[in-house]
Structure formats: C-alpha cells, structure tokens
Design a protein with these regions (language model features):
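N-terminal export signals
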Residues: 6-27
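H/E-rich (His + Asp/Glu) clusters that bind or coordinate divalent metals
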Residues: 44, 61, 88-89, 96, ...
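Histidine-centered catalytic micro-motifs
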Residues: 77-85, 209-213, 267-271
C-alpha cells in the first residue's frame, strides 16, 4: 500500500521535514484536510518571498491553454490496486456509486490481511461480489524458525477457500517482506524460504501484487538537489543504512519472477522505476509472467509526457490501471486526465505532493483499452477456481 495517499489527504504542509501540522491531531480525514489547508493559507499570507517554505509553495499556472475535465474514463476500467478504504456499509455503497459514475467496473481490494482480519473485510464487501475482489496477505509467523512454509501455505489455501482471489499487497522496501502488520525482517522475495509460498500462489491461480522499493528520491540525499524533496522527506530511506537499495530490490523482483514462472506477479507502482522506464521495459521483456500496475505513480510520470507515452505505447499489454489513493471522484478524474488528455503544465496539490507541473500523456485508444481493462481482464480470466 502506498501510504502517501493518506498524507496527501491529511494535508502535506507541516508533515514533511518534521514540521507540526493540524492534520497530525485531527480526528478525521476531513478535519485534517481542512486544518492543514487553513494552516497553509495563514503561512502563505504572511510569508515573504525570502521566507516562503517549499512545503507551502502552491503555484498556479498562468498559461491560457486548454483544460480538460474528465469525469468518466473513456473506456471501462478495472482498478487493480486499491485497499479497504471504505469501513462501513454506507461508505462501501458510496464507493460503488462513485465507481458507476467514473466508469470503474471492478476494484481489487488488496487487504494485506490473513486470518480473522481478512475474513472480516471479506464479509464487509460481500454485498458487491461483482464489483470488489478481496486479495489476501501472507502469514509470516515463524519465518525466522526452521520449517517455515507449510503454515503460510495452509493459511493461503484457507484464505482462497474464504474468498481470496489473489495476494497483495506484499511489501519489501529493502528491509524484508511485510504483509500488513506482519513483518519478516531480512527475508526478501527471492529467499528460498518463500519458494513454496510463491509456488502455491501459482498452483492456486492467485496473482501476486508485489511492492518492491520506493521512488528514487527517497534514497537520495535530502538536500537542494533532490528533485522530489517535498514528497521524499516523509518517506526517506537515505537514513537507513544496510537496506537493499532500489536497484537491488528490482534485481530481487526479477530473480523471484524468473524462479516462479507459473506464478503471475504484478509489480506495484511501476516497480518504482518511474524514473527509469527504459529499465522497466527491459525487466518486462525478460519476465513474461510479470505485469506492472501504474497506481500512485501518475505525478511521477506526468512531467515526462512524451517519453512516458512512448513507454505506454510499447508496453501497453503489460501495464494495468490502479489507483491506491482512496475512492473519491476527483481522484479518479485526475488519473484519467493524465492518461487521456494532452493538457500541459497543470498542478494538482490535493492528490500529489510534488512541486512540479503535470502534463497529459494523450494515450491512444488502443493503449487505453489495454491498460484500463483488457490486460486485467485477461490476467484475471486465467485464474483457477
């Protein structure tokens, strides 16, 4: 799960770089959002150009150019990366209404959970079996003891019987695997202890949503040269010596997919190679059982629209749509605007935390159909049971 979505909703100002924020003490997302907005307004009203902080920078484009509002996707969509954001029946009903209005046919709920926690989420969403799919996590209990594996496999099989259709989101940002609150420090996806679990996923026909590393800016020095500093600081990894770096985690991802060709893997967030799409293309070419979801990496690719559009065109059959940013309609709309329009130099501070301007990629209808729906539909149709 990309927790930055919650930071975006709570208000960026004051969270990054250790600054205090009304959002940190708010009882609800709405209160946090309103409070942070008020704080930012007060700061910017009193700040001079010499004292204005980068975190309070809220530029507005001066260009008189077309602005495209896209309320509904051009083609039907399957969202391959979301989480159980809706906690009540009423919220789930609202989510379905939003999906209807924006053109989302089905959403994958990556619960990251096992046991009773998974069962409870499954029950909550059972009202809409055609609109939501539950994906479970892994049970890493005893991972550091001899004989790990059979227990995790048994719980995976139980979750499948309870309604799980896939696995995710499984994390490894360099310190070891994590599935929700369950952690396995030092055990990475290519560890032999995981072989039986990955093989069972393939045997059960359960695709795996695997999140490796984090964006490149989190690994760089937090200084004036860091292009993504506004978003990087809160999630920084440069101060954690000994972790596997971004490139090393991508190597681990490749070794894992190569060893388990009968298992389908989905690399979350473009495998965090949004800054090096050429390498991601090479990884996809070498691994036919690997897809990449584009969730929560819209702001990272929108600054390079021509190169990103070329990448989407070349690898359209290996990319799947995802959000990972809640379920409100404006959130869906900004993803559609980036993918479909040719808009230039616009800002989006409600969903993203970067300072730079965004651009539409203007993807072809052929690419949109594949990324929005066809790839996911084909991937899901290949499953067993």
């Amino acid at each position: 799960m990309d927790r930055r979505s919650f930071v975006k909703r709570a208000g960026w100002a004051g969270i990054a770089a250790g600054f205090s924020s009304t959002a940190a003490f708010a009882d609800t997302v709405e209160e946090a959002k309103a409070g942070a907005h008020t704080d930012a307004q007060a700061t910017t009203k009193t700040a001079s150009p010499e004292t204005l902080l980068l975190k309070d920078y809220r530029p507005k484009s001066i260009y008189k150019i077309p602005v495209t509002e896209i309320a509904k996707a051009k083609f039907p969509v399957i969202d391959m990366h979301s989480h159980p954001y809706a906690k009540t029946e009423a919220e789930i009903d609202d989510w379905v209404r939003n999906m209807d209005e924006v053109g989302i046919e089905k959403t994958m709920i990556l619960t990251m959970s096992t046991g009773a926690a998974f069962d409870e989420i499954q029950r909550k969403y059972a009202k809409y079996p055609e609109r939501f799919e539950m994906w479970c996590g892994f049970d890493f209990t005893g991972y550091d003891k001899p004989g790990f594996g059979p227990g995790a496999v048994k719980e995976l099989e139980r979750c499948k019987q309870a309604g799980a259709r896939g696995v995710g989101e499984i994390h490894d940002k360099g310190q070891g695997l994590r599935s929700g609150k369950l952690k396995a420090p030092g055990m990475h996806p290519d560890d032999p202890r995981m072989d039986a679990v990955w093989e069972k996923c393939g045997e059960l026909g359960m695709p795996v949503s695997l999140h490796v590393a984090d964006p490149i800016w989190m690994y760089q020095k937090m200084d004036r040269y860091n292009d993504g500093l506004m978003n990087a600081y809160e999630w920084r990894l440069d101060n954690q010596p000994g972790i596997v770096g971004l490139s090393g985690m991508v190597d681990i991802l490749e070794r894992t997919t190569a060893r388990h060709r009968n298992t389908t893997f989905i690399a979350c967030h473009l495998a965090n190679l949004d800054y090096d799409l050429a390498r991601l293309g090479e990884v996809l070419e070498r691994n036919p059982n690997l897809y990449a979801d584009i969730s929560a990496r819209y702001a990272e690719t929108a600054p390079i629209p021509r190169f990103a559009a070329q990448f989407y065109g070349k690898y359209a059959e290996r990319l799947v749509y995802g959000t990972d940013m809640g379920f409100d309609k404006p959130m869906y709309g900004i993803t559609f605007r980036i993918l479909e329009s040719l808009d230039e130099h616009f800002y989006e501070v409600d969903q993203f935390s970067y300072h730079w301007a965004l651009n539409g990629l203007g993807l072809s209808d052929e690419a949109l159909k594949k990324v929005y729906l066809e790839n996911a539909a084909e991937l899901l149709a290949r499953r067993k049971g």
